[in-house]
C-alpha cells in the first residue's frame, strides 16, 4: 500500500458508506506538520491514513478539523473518513493504535451522520501555548514547551491580551503565506494561566489564521519581558501589517486542545491537555 494515495473523504457520506469520526492526539516534534507531504517526508496524516488502511484492508483518506504546522502538537484533533467496511468502533481505536507510532494515538471513535464534517461542522477551536519561564532550559520538556529564559510579567501579558478578544482583522498576526480568504476572526477568550514555571496562553476562537497563535504568543512574550509597552498589542492589531507584529514564537509549545461542534453530534470531550498541564483548571467560555 506504499504506492496508494487514499482518496479524500467526501463532503457527505454516500449511500452504503459510514462516516466515522476519530479523536486524535499526537506529539508533532518529528513530523512536517499534519498534512501529507511528498514521499519520504513524515506527516501525521500519512501515518494515520496508513494505519487506518491496514485496519480497513483498503485505502482510507481522512479530513481533519485543523491542519497543524511542523512540530505542533494536538490533544484534541478530530478527523473523519468514509468507509463501506464494517468494523467495530473498538477496532478503529485499538486496531489503528496498534499500527501507529508511539507519538500518535486515536482516543475515541464514533459513527456520525452523513452531514458531519470534521472541519466545516466545527464551531470553535481552542489552542494552548505552553511557555517554560526559567533561566535553565527544561530537558524533560524539550520540544513540548517553548523555553523563554527572560522573566515574564504575566500581569502585563494578561492586560495586553484583552485587546485581542472579540472580532478583529488579524492581518498583523497571519503568516505571509496564509491562504485564508478573510483575516477577520472572532476570539472568544485569550487567557494567560500559571502552572508552576509554566505560563500558558489559552485561546479559543471560531477559526485561526496560519501562524496566528504563535504570532500572538510572540507579541505577548515581548510585552511580558518588558521590551515593548502593553499598548503595543493594540498597535500591532490596528496596523493590519505582518511587519508590525514582531517575531513568530517557536512551534514546540503549541497544542490544538479542543474542537467544538454542535450538540447534535454528541462527540466526547476529553481533558484539554497536554498531559503535563493536567492540574490546570478548565475555564469554560
UniProtKB/Swiss-Prot annotation:
Q: Name one GO biological process term.
A: tRNA pseudouridine synthesis
HAMAP family registered for this protein in UniProt: TruA
Task: State how it assembles.
Answer: Homodimer.
This one is known as: tRNA pseudouridine synthase A
The answer on whether this UniProt entry bears the keyword Endoplasmic reticulum reads no
Q: Where is the active site?
A: 69 (nucleophile)
NCBIfam families noted in UniProt = hisT_truA
Gene Ontology terms, MF aspect: pseudouridine synthase activity; RNA binding; tRNA pseudouridine(38-40) synthase activity
User: What EC designation does it have?
Assistant: 5.4.99.12
Reaction(s) catalyzed by this protein?
Answer: uridine(38/39/40) in tRNA = pseudouridine(38/39/40) in tRNA
Q: Which UniProt keywords apply?
A: Isomerase, tRNA processing
Q: Which family does it belong to?
A: Belongs to the tRNA pseudouridine synthase TruA family.
Q: What class of enzyme is it?
A: isomerase
User: Where do the annotations place substrate binding?
Assistant: 127
Q: Name one Pfam family in it.
A: PseudoU_synth_1
Please give the function described in this protein's UniProt entry. Formation of pseudouridine at positions 38, 39 and 40 in the anticodon stem and loop of transfer RNAs.
InterPro entries recorded: PsdUridine_synth_cat_dom_sf, PsdUridine_synth_TruA, PsdUridine_synth_TruA_a/b_dom, PsdUridine_synth_TruA_C, TruA/RsuA/RluB/E/F_N
